[in-house]
Amino acid sequence: MAPSKQYSEGGQLQLMDAERIEEEEECFESIDKLISQGINSGDVKKLQDAGIYTCNGLMMHTKKSLTGIKGLSEAKVDKICEAAEKLLSQGFITGSDLLIKRKSVVRITTGSQALDKLLGGGIETLCITEAFGEFRSGKTQLAHTLCVSAQLPIHMHGGNGKVAYIDTEGTFRPERIVPIAERFGMDANAVLDNIIYARAYTYEHQYNLLLGLAAKMAEEPFRLLIVDSVIALFRVDFSGRGELAERQQKLAQMLSRLTKIAEEFNVAVYITNQVIADPGGGMFITDLKKPAGGHVLAHAATIRLMLRKGKGEQRVCKIFDAPNLPEGEAVFQVTSGGIMDAKD
């Protein structure tokens, strides 16, 4: 594994020491460890070619999907799964053990103390955080700020890792990263080097990018995956009620993949979503809009944030749904340096 980059408080890049690298690697079991359990190296290579690079990721696949990999028979798949189970603990654990496991969650600062407080410390790893709202509500601006803050050291409320950005609308601007990096006292070129970017043009392309991402995350310490926006290409590639069922099925597969990436590699997944008209919202509701994606997206996102425009450059974030956060709102501001606390 190549040495990874880390920032000091002054923004200078440092090489992570061996102990820190070892901690990163302990987040998951490499698929190569199956060889020590008697699995043929050729079969391990077939798994890697199919986008499976960790034992954790392997156990997130059904045996039906694994037997679909060329060269893997049902008997081989059974043997591979048995070997993976020996390396992992996939059964029941106590609530106390789960609480200890939850201590591995990293919370990445949004750049605004008020917004961080609302979110319980920032954007969480191990889950999907969805932000939805109209255009200019701050969704993409928050994404740009997170690209930088995710690379801050842990003690500075960052994620100390790299960022993967999948852009479906062509709104990512590398020049926007420069002033945000300068605000945090970081080297802009180094920050940009730690962001891998891909422009997706179809929903299939978007899904294939996620499959290829596993190889990179298995080799280097990533802490954040951004998809901006998760629904745009599905709304283009599937039209009309006749294709709605297929669209939702494909969307569910995409979201399942995002969930697995979050849990497999301990990364935060931040997705943006569009809004649509809600004709059944009621006569007393003035803003008849709801997030796109229906129940499929609603159930997949762990934390749902509703963003709306405020006064001037101010934006308002409301907790729309979260398992561990109370309802509430926070006001923040979009500046040249990214997301900050609102100024009166």
Swiss-Prot record:
Something else known: Plant silencing DMC1A are sterile due to defects in homologous pairing and subsequent chromosome segregation during male meiosis.
- Assigned protein family: Belongs to the RecA family. DMC1 subfamily.
Where does it reside? Nucleus
One Pfam family, please name it: Rad51
Give the protein's function.
Answer: Recombinase that may participate in meiotic recombination, specifically in homologous strand assimilation, which is required for the resolution of meiotic double-strand breaks. Exhibits DNA-dependent ATPase activity when bound to single-stranded DNA (ssDNA). Mediates renaturation of homologous complementary strands as well as assimilation of single strands into homologous supercoiled duplexes leading to D-loop formation. Binds circular single-stranded DNA (ssDNA) and circular double-stranded DNA (dsDNA) in vitro. Catalyzes DNA homologous renaturation and DNA strand exchange.
Q: State whether keyword Transmembrane helix applies.
A: no
The protein's gene is named: DMC1A
Which keywords belong to this entry?
Answer: ATP-binding, Cell cycle, DNA-binding, Meiosis, Nucleotide-binding, Nucleus
Coiled-coil boundaries: none
One GO biological-process annotation of the entry reads: reciprocal meiotic recombination
Residue numbers binding dsDNA: 235, 241, 247
**Gene Ontology terms, cellular component aspect?**
condensed nuclear chromosome; nucleus
Provide any one GO MF term from the record: ATP-dependent DNA damage sensor activity
Which source organism?
A: Oryza sativa subsp. japonica (Rice)
**Residues noted as binding ATP in the record, renumbered to the chain:** 133-140
* Protein's name according to its UniProt entry: Meiotic recombination protein DMC1 homolog A
User: Which residues are listed for ssDNA binding in this entry?
Assistant: 235, 238, 241, 247, 315
Q: What is its main location?
A: nucleus
- Expression sites by tissue: Expressed in meiotic young panicles.
